[in-house]
Structures are given as structure tokens and as C-alpha cells.
Amino acid sequence: RVVDNPAVMNEIKDAVAAGHPNMDPEMAKGCFRGAPVMVFIARDKSYDFSAYDCGLMAQNIMLSAWSMGVGSMCLGSPVRFLTDNDACKPVLERLGFSEGYELCLCVGLGYADEAPDAKPRDINKVKFVE
């Protein structure tokens, strides 16, 4: 499901805050890291590899977005925040996932504020099997 309506985004953030009263309110309000569009990806609970399929879908969304100049980020925390309490159940119902499906991943989309150079990588962390 794609959510780009700011009012709906705020409703979801408010539900996260209500479901986690001990969480810093700013953290709850920032759970989507400022992304103006969120894609909520659901998995088929009856298929044990469906989470991998969701990951591949998220990757394709992110690569496609980047090809059009749109930044993206894969977020797991909102999944936990939305599924570990009863206060968020109305939000999940509003997303309207089919019977037998559950929220698996969130992908935030938007135009990046910055484009830093890639950090140096340590090639020694890669192990080649001969």
C-alpha cells in the first residue's frame, strides 16, 4: 500500500506514539525519517519465504525510484512499532491488507536532502572462498 497523504501519515505516527507511551514522542513522530511517501509491503503468512520476496520487491522499488532521481530507505522499525500493540490495529486495518497477509517492510520515498560520497570500504571484510 502506498501512503502519500500527510494527514494519513500523521495518523499513523500518532498511532505509533499512542502504542508506545514510553517512547520519546519525537522518535515516534520521526519513525518515517521525514519521507513524504511510504510504501507498506505485506507478506503472505502461509508462505515461509514470503519475507524474502518482500525484500526483493522493496529492492526493486528502491532501484526504480533511484533511476528516476527519487531517494529511498528500507525501514523495519515502523513494522515493529505498528504490529506490537493494539493501538495501531486500526491503522493496519486501514491499510487494507488481504486476509492472511501481514506488514513486513516499509519503504520511504522522497528527494534526498544530501548526496554524500560513499564511505571507504574495508575489502578485508569480504571473504572469498577458494
Named regions from a protein language model:
Residues 1-130:
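Acidic, surface-exposed loops and disordered segments
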